[in-house]
UniProtKB/Swiss-Prot annotation:
GTP binds at Q12, D73, S142, G146, T147, T181, N208, N230. The keyword Repeat does not apply. One of its GO terms (molecular function) is hydrolase activity. It catalyses: GTP + H2O = GDP + phosphate + H(+). It comes from the Eukaryota. This is Tubulin alpha-2 chain. One of its GO terms (cellular component) is cytoplasm. It comes from Emericella nidulans (strain FGSC A4 / ATCC 38163 / CBS 112.46 / NRRL 194 / M139) (Aspergillus nidulans). Keywords: Cytoplasm, Cytoskeleton, GTP-binding, Hydrolase, Magnesium, Metal-binding, Microtubule, Nucleotide-binding. Belongs to the tubulin family.
Amino acid sequence: MRGEVCHIHIGQAGTQLGNSAWELYLLEHGLGADGRLDPEKGEDINAGGSFETFFTETGSGKYVPRSIFVDLDPSPIDEIRTGPYRQLFHPEQLISGKEDAANNYARGHYTVGKELVDTVVDRVRRLSDNCSSLQGFLVFHSFGGGTGSGFGALLLERLSTEYGKKSKLEFAVYPSPRVSTAVVEPYNAVLSTHSTIENSDCTFLVDNEAVYDICRRNLDIPRPSFEHLNRLIAQVVSSITSSLRFDGALNVDLNEFQTNLVPFPRIHYPLISYAPVISSNRSSHESFKVQDLTLQCAEPNNQMVVCDPRNGKYMAVALLYRGDCVPRDCTQAIASLKAKASFNLVEWCPTGFKVGINYQKPARVPGSELAPVDRSVSMLSNTTAISEAWSRLDHKFDLMYSKRAFVHWYVGEGMEEGEFSEAREDLAALEKDYEEVAGDSLDMEGEEAEY
């Protein structure tokens, strides 16, 4: 028994990411769209996978996901209620409001969100009572929207009071440098980050622009849709949890991510990269050796946030291998990665690598552009380069806030203006934390010289 994981999908981004993630989980476990075992898949799949982690089995042999979908706007959840997976989810796990948060953090956090949050916490309690040893929560939401930022922050506050000791990992869609879906994104993101720094154990950032570029460049999709993006992100989410569900040489559970990736409590924003992202018509010309995939993950253009890790230092890296891999190959691949000049580890963390190896091959969604492959690597790296992303965001926030543009919408929903400056100061402190961590080694040398 490896412990269960509850998924919580918040807002439109979280809900659509959830759709892609569950689509993939069903394939990996050989289940049909109604949550029953697919007779065509046969018995072989069932042998290796543990269903309990993500699914509750009912008396009639149906598997129900341990997940909750919440949105203040009814339409994304209605899509699930009428979509191909309407038989899969428990109707009580799909919670929608009457009016949306209108891209406004304050509506999601104070006015509209307040009415729904008790219902949601109650549903979470029911899910967790159903678990024999709950490992933790995976929370999916965006930082730019109203529900994702406001309600997401509110729910995480409640979760950390009720489930303080359980891991809470977030997958957050972060505002991109050039692709924007809302004018007030910088406000929402700064406010949301401020309130989740304390309440989340580890937050994996994904930004749409970076994933767009990966889809365009590697999958030859001229105009990628959100579905393409979500399917790619789902592969990473699946690798992170694959050890909980399938057997492997080195298994990794949720607590190990925190232990190995988060050197200081506030610095918990790892980057994600995934390889191989390749289309079916190119795959015959490529080598998928463990070493090649590992080096691909370290390339800036395979990362899911627009920032250049060559400008920063790595504090900790988790490499999750999946499929046909043996530990020896992985060790060699890591050695060659460490030898690269562009790969800088901080001096106070000499080992720096956590490895997971899982024997389950990456599954491929029928009709997706990703080529079927025998092995894949996900790299989660906590690097100081991510502070580039924070400073970009802070700069946009400052431009708008200097004129107090759009602030009245937030104040009108019961927020105080002081909260803006408080949140902004907190993020300035976060940037400072990252600078100090990167510069620590230099101070040490100065001190030694004095003695």
